[in-house]
């Protein structure tokens, strides 16, 4: 799996979680989860659950501030799966 594939799947998960009806194609690596996409702490928790289901990767996020952008989440998943990270 590549980081592009991770991004594509994660964009779909995120698009399902936000209330503003964002299309997966609008979720870029540099999209900020809270500011740009409107993801709140409950949606982050749901997103982490779905990440575990879809990717088999458990992200230990003790501080939600460690996942500020989609790129942060993609890289966290890639590291968990022992894959190269997105630049």
Task: Annotate each PLM feature.
Residues 2-36, 43-49, 53-87:
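Phosphopantetheine-dependent thiolation modules in NRPS/PKS and related acyl-activating systems
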């Amino acid at each position: 799996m590549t980081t592009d594939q991770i991004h594509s799947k994660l964009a779909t998960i995120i698009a399902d979680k936000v209330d503003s009806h964002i299309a997966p194609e609008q979720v870029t690596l540099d999209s900020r989860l809270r500011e740009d996409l409107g993801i709140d702490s409950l949606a982050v928790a749901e997103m982490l659950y779905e990440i575990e289901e879809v990717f088999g990767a458990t992200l230990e996020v003790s501080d939600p501030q460690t996942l500020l952008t989609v790129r942060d989440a993609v890289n966290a998943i890639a590291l968990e799966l022992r894959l190269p990270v997105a630049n």
